[in-house]
Amino acid sequence: MDLEKYIFMYAKKVNLLNMNKEELLIFFDKLGEKPFRSHQIMRWIYHYYCDDFNYMTNISKSLKERLKQIAEIRAPIIIKEQLSSDGTIKWAMKIDEQQIETVYIPENKRTTLCVSSQIGCPLGCSFCGTAQQGFNRNLNVSEIIGQVWRAAQLINLNKKIKIKNNRFPITNIVFMGMGEPLLNIVNVVSAIRIILDDFGFKLSKRHITLSTAGIVPGIEKLKNMIDIPLAISLHAPNDIIRNKIMPINKKYNINSVLEAARRYSMDTKSNHGRITIEYVLLKNINDDVLHAHQLAKQLQGIPCKINLIPWNPIPNIRYACSSQIRMRAFLKVLLKYNIVTIIRKIRGADINAACGQLTGEVINRINLQYNSL
């Protein structure tokens, strides 16, 4: 079917943020345009943060008029901004009538954007604020890449943040926001391809990290789709504890998750094959030195580093953060096993932007059965 007839029939414009370079090539080919048009459009979108065809000076007037009829460049809208005392920024972005949250973390020579992949999350981890919100749906490509685009656009417009003209102001992107990325793997990987593309944001693979609670089939799929650093949200040294705090462990237990991580490490080159293990420290739950010994033994033979994460308070969740003494004792044990381990610095806790605190606003919750994951 002719592209413009299709759009006329369904009365819906094509959002160009949903398309990677290959898809844009097909799109412009169907319009009878040369392949270089896709490159021009991508430069305007991702290098100049332009969402108005009228300002694209090297696009012909006739093509501009045609694009205005059938296409749009539409990213999520920021409806609220919160600034932490440590410089972290949290943006609430509107998706339909719901909200997702995206976090910008500036450091000395590094800036990290924490991106969401779903509206809510279906996994129900008992210590996580996102899980308490329930789950509505996966984000599409434009809603994922749109978070990056909107953040970069806003930062470049902010004269208080020193950025060279039109330079991409983000050095690292982590898929650690709302949702489980591997349950939305097709859209997430498509968005990552745009981030990596020279006509997109031109970020290096080693500066993107995807975090998963351990969706084993997703880990296997990911390594065949794209080679990027992987983080495993483990949070327990054994199945007894993990079953209690992470229900997904009843579907994919620790052994199966770590075996998938081991294979990912062997079959990928990003981050030199090293996996990041994330471990939130919950007082009197998983923070004993015996747990540290168990964890170290579980990780034997897997090239990895461990991020120990102080638990951040979340309303209506009855956990507490480990004491500094217990955290340091836990760290000391892991270092004795020669495992690279750090205690992650808390950022953005005063605006509920720290690890596990993102909630957004989820309506029309959907219950997913674990056998469908």
Curated annotation (Swiss-Prot):
Catalysed reaction equations from the record: adenosine(2503) in 23S rRNA + 2 reduced [2Fe-2S]-[ferredoxin] + 2 S-adenosyl-L-methionine = 2-methyladenosine(2503) in 23S rRNA + 5'-deoxyadenosine + L-methionine + 2 oxidized [2Fe-2S]-[ferredoxin] + S-adenosyl-L-homocysteine; adenosine(37) in tRNA + 2 reduced [2Fe-2S]-[ferredoxin] + 2 S-adenosyl-L-methionine = 2-methyladenosine(37) in tRNA + 5'-deoxyadenosine + L-methionine + 2 oxidized [2Fe-2S]-[ferredoxin] + S-adenosyl-L-homocysteine
NADP recorded as keyword: no
Main location: cytoplasm
UniProt binding sites for S-adenosyl-L-methionine: 179-180, 211, 233-235, 312
Subcellular location field: Cytoplasm
InterPro entries: Aldolase_TIM, Methyltransferase_A, RlmN_N, RNA_MTrfase_RlmN, rRNA_lsu_MTrfase_RlmN/Cfr, rSAM
Classification via PROSITE patterns: RADICAL_SAM
Binding site for [4Fe-4S] cluster: 121, 125, 128
Membrane-spanning ranges: none
Tagged with keyword Acetylation: no
GO CC terms of this entry: cytoplasm
Note: Reaction proceeds by a ping-pong mechanism involving intermediate methylation of a conserved cysteine residue.
Family in the record: Belongs to the radical SAM superfamily. RlmN family.
Function statement: Specifically methylates position 2 of adenine 2503 in 23S rRNA and position 2 of adenine 37 in tRNAs. m2A2503 modification seems to play a crucial role in the proofreading step occurring at the peptidyl transferase center and thus would serve to optimize ribosomal fidelity.
Official protein name in the record: Dual-specificity RNA methyltransferase RlmN
Species whose genome carries this gene: Blochmanniella pennsylvanica (strain BPEN)
